[in-house]
Amino acid sequence: MRQAYDVVVLGSGAAGLTAALAAATQGAERVAVFEKAGLLGGTTALSGGTIWIPANQPAREAGVEDSREQGLEYLASLSNGMILPELAEALVDGGPRFVDFLNANTEIRLRLVRGYPDYHPEHPGGLPGGGRSIEPALVSFAGLEEWTDRIAGDVRRSLIAETPLGGGTGVVPPDVLAEREEAKQEGLGRALIGGLLRACLKHGVHIATRSRGLRLLLDDHVVAGVELETPDGHQSIHADAVILATGGFEYDPDLVRDFLRGPLTKPVGAPTDTGDGLRMAMRIGAQLGNMREAWWSPIISYPGVRRDGGGNALLSARERALPGSIMVNRYGRRFCNEAANYNALGGAFHRLDESRLDFVNVPAYMIFDQSMVDRFGAFGVGPGGEMPDWVTRAQTLDDLAEVFGLPAAELRATVDRFNENARNGVDPDFARGESAYDRWPGAGHAADPDSPRSALGPLEAAPFYGAEVAISALGTKGGPRTDREGRVLDVDGDVIPGLYAAGNVMASPAGMVYGGAGATLAVAGVWGLYAGRAAVQDRGRTARTD
């Protein structure tokens, strides 16, 4: 039996489900989502669910002063020539439209994460006091029945704003948690996926898992469907439009080696991110862009395997910025502003030593002391709590150096210098604490939240702790180039009829930039919306131009 749809979407993360819902609400009667994995949601379901949108409605309602022009100025200040102005405009203009779309078509309601600074807040157009990071309010999964267990990620009945990283205490009262459990309410990335999934099902979107896209079907140079690998064998699915939302290629070692600018040693997103959509687009002559870049992040791995088969890891964005911690390379030396945002730190890990011709900061080691544990806690453990078994503990810095194979004398000298400067509230080596973003994790505990001391404190209270830090990525940022509405372009810059892309599979409109918390999902949501609508609007055309 011939299977045919108006629109086929490959991938079920925020980009894919938004695209499917956009197509269905635009008038497409037959829409299907095919997901490679056995679980829905992709990397979105594993995420915090935060979305970075300049001049967003929740911020405006909270009295935050922001504008389209400020958002564009901010992105331009960070571009380094890698952001195309027309795509930056599409991103900034599309953000509020995405919020409106969710309000009109789903139960998802986005709320401001108050105070969360942009990742480079002192740049022109940046917001040191926050206002661009918004997150879904709790979403009820009641009525989703078996679909609830088919979404990746762990159940989280909390908000980013309730966590220490989001400015909260990290403690939700037991009676509140009980109420949320009874109502089947969830937060973070699963809330975003659950809300989108319910809306897709309501609009009759067909959802199938364990269905991997292999190659695109062409009819006289027009994309006319896709060949799938399914539990029932290979199937040819015909469609007026195909939207690629398959995620990045961080789990494919060959693609990582051939394209990325430096090491990516331990990916943390959905394990199905092996470049399927990229390969499909390459086979039919798609133009590629931004292939060197990823949404970089240092991570600390810990034992265990997630439900989707990926390894457990922590971004440690909070711990790296707290007083009483530093990060050193294999030579026992600091090499960066540890409190900087995780994407920017990718550059520090990719620094090539010209004499050794080696990435000397890979791996790195986070070192902290008992005073940090007592004041702040770490890795999900509250202040004064016992550190997990996978965190190395030693009574002296020399003992810690021996465990990690670091030169003890160099480590001691590094800590001595850092301690002296920290007591004076300065970091002349890497300017840690000078940015509002650096100070955000520790500001709530500081006498002066605007002082660098919010991010600086000596390491001197035994025992000392350490953990290996690898360079990872939340996803890659390179792939087929698109126009501002998600249409995939060929090597000559012309539209490939019938093919669209959204999310991490595409050449990111953000270039090398990570504007603030939620920038990945902003691209996913905005281009999912664009691609889904364009796929319906373009139906019946045999050729297209920008």
Spans of features found by a protein language model:
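Extreme N-terminal leader/targeting segments of oxidoreductases
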Residues: 1-7, 25-28, 510, 514, ...
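N-terminal Rossmann-like FAD-binding beta1-loop-alpha1 element of flavoenzymes
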Residues: 7-33
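Conserved N-terminal glycine-rich FAD pyrophosphate-binding loop of Rossmann-like flavoproteins
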Residues: 37-63, 73
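Conserved redox-cofactor binding core of oxidoreductases
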Residues: 92-232, 301-302, 415, 422-449
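An anion/pyrophosphate-binding glycine-rich loop and adjacent beta-alpha core
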Residues: 121, 128-129, 138-166, 170, ...
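Glycine-rich loop(s) and the adjacent beta-strand/alpha-helix scaffold that form part
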Residues: 183-190, 202, 230-305, 353, ...
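A glycine-rich dinucleotide-binding beta-alpha-beta segment and adjacent secondary-structure elements
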Residues: 215-222, 410-509, 513
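Helix-rich C-terminal "cap"/substrate-channel and partner-interaction subdomain
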Residues: 355-463, 534, 538, 545-546
